[in-house]
Amino acid sequence: MKFFIDTANLDQIREANELGVLDGVTTNPSLMAKEGIRGVENQRKHYLEICEIVGGDVSAEVIATDLEGMIKEGEELAALHPNIVVKVPCIEAGIKAIKYFTRKGIRTNCTLVFSVGQALLAAKAGATYVSPFVGRLDDIASDGIELVRKIVEMYDYYDYDTQVLAASIRSTQHIIQCVEAGADVATCPLSAIKRSEEGRGGSEC
């Protein structure tokens, strides 16, 4: 299973990369804002800085929620660097955008996935990654890990190429459970990666 770090903090990305186990990065507008990075140009410069640190995929999320806006943003993001993966929300316009990007050879990460049905649509549209939100489902008394397991089983059964990128990881126990469920990738905060290194399997992040 691959490890991605879920942050826009360059120091944390460097620290995770120095461990020698980092395979990529996921970001979103909220994480960018948390680091004080605002404005399209500043965000894009920041994505390039991340790409200089990490050799793997870097998910950069579109802000638009309409199809035309997503396509425009996504094409601009993809043109920044070969490692950029365009992160698109799992809404109707998002699925259409993913299909468009697939035809153009642009890789995508379908985010905000909370059901098997959404994961199926994303895979049929050709998403590179699909991101079920484990912690957020657990927050509403649902079972995020079970969703990961069901998506993995579906993709295996129908031979979809889409990779399952488990997101909203809240503990190292979540990481262990994602491994057991067969997730291709777990994206998590630096604290979870470091606690795994320390062998603290049940610790909260």
Where are these regions (language model features)?
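Catalytic cores of alpha/beta
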Residues: 11-19, 69-73, 97, 115-125, ...
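Charge-dense, low-complexity polyampholytic segments
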Residues: 45, 190-197
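Active-site beta->alpha loop and helix N-cap motifs at the rims of alpha/beta catalytic domains
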Residues: 3-5, 9-13, 19-21, 27-100, ...
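A structured, mid-to-C-terminal "fold-capping" secondary-structure block
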Residues: 180-193, 203
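Conserved small/polar residues in nucleotide/adenosyl-binding loops
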Residues: 198-205
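Conserved anion-binding
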Residues: 53, 57, 81, 96-97, ...
